């Protein structure tokens, strides 16, 4: 998931039981995919991503970014001699059932490894802009690419450490933070690919960096009125999240996203 649940509680108001469900089933909350390809360009999708966009336009934008990110990873996997199996996208309102248990809009976008699907309530993007101060279509694109990053981790078996650690995966250097920062880095790799194809506009990367920082554990804990407690972190600090996204964007290299060991 893109952002941490504040103090193992509720970064978006999610009740404690949902945190437990997420830890038990391995769901990646807060920010997943695949559908038919589209010939519509990103510039066309941007026109639909404005404040007055309809639900259909918003769904079209999410689907486009999801497919484009998955096409990027399909090529990356081929370079590694592997086959990429795309995730599926589920758009829902308020609540839904998943292979990882009950899903709620309060959890934000999330990826469920049990059914290899990304779940998004489109209302989250309004919250991302208004509550978290991260507006813009590329802020939204970062969220989607982050969730696909979790699917990449699951496909490659990189999420096994968190499943093995269970609740003990929390903390500033825990398995949960390492996986989330890697997903941020993977989102940066997709952004790098977009830049190489001349799809980015001025300010896009700034929007993504702002979104990454907005959902840092420390910033969310302060926003919730509590003290910053690194031992309860599940996603990393605002600085870490932005830095790892930038690392993926700057390099475009899978190897640059190794968060399994070493300093974060």
Model-derived segments and their meaning:
Residues 28, 32-101:
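A metal-dependent hydrolase signature that marks the N-terminal structural subdomain at the beginning
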Residues 124-142, 171-177:
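Short pre-active-site segment immediately N-terminal to the catalytic Zn-binding motif
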Residues 215-264:
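Pan-zinc metallopeptidase signature
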Residues 148-163, 192-195:
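Catalytic Zn2+-binding segment of zinc metalloproteases
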Residues 1-49:
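Long amphipathic alpha-helical segments used for membrane anchoring, targeting, substrate engagement
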Residues 56, 60-84, 174, 178-221:
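Short helix/loop segments within enzyme catalytic domains
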């Amino acid at each position: 998931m893109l952002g941490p649940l504040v103090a193992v509680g509720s970064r978006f108001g999610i009740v404690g039981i949902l945190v437990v469900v997420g830890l038990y089933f391995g769901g990646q909350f807060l920010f997943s995919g695949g559908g038919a390809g589209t010939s519509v360009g990103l510039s066309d999708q941007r026109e639909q991503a404005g404040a007055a966009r309809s639900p259909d336009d918003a769904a079209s934008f999410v689907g486009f970014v999801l497919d484009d990110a998955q096409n990027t990873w399909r090529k990356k996997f081929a370079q590694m001699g592997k086959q990429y199996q795309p995730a599926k996208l589920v758009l829902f309102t308020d609540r839904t059932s998943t292979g990882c248990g009950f899903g709620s809009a309060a959890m934000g976008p999330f990826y469920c490894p049990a059914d290899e699907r990304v779940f998004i309530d489109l209302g989250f993007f309004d919250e991302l802009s208004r509550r978290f101060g991260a507006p813009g279509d590329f802020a939204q694109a970062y969220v989607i690419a982050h969730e696909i990053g979790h699917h990449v981790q699951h496909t490659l078996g990189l999420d096994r450490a968190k499943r093995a650690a269970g609740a003990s995966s929390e903390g500033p250097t825990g398995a949960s933070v390492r996986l989330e920062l890697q997903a941020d880095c993977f989102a940066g790799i997709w952004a790098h690919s977009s830049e190489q194809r001349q799809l980015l506009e001025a300010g896009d990367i700034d929007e993504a960096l702002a979104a990454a920082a907005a959902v840092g554990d420390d910033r969310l804990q302060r926003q919730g009125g509590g003290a910053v407690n690194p031992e309860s972190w599940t996603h990393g600090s605002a600085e870490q999240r932005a830095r790892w996204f930038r690392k993926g964007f700057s390099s475009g290299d899978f190897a640059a996203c190794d968060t399994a060991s070493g300093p974060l």
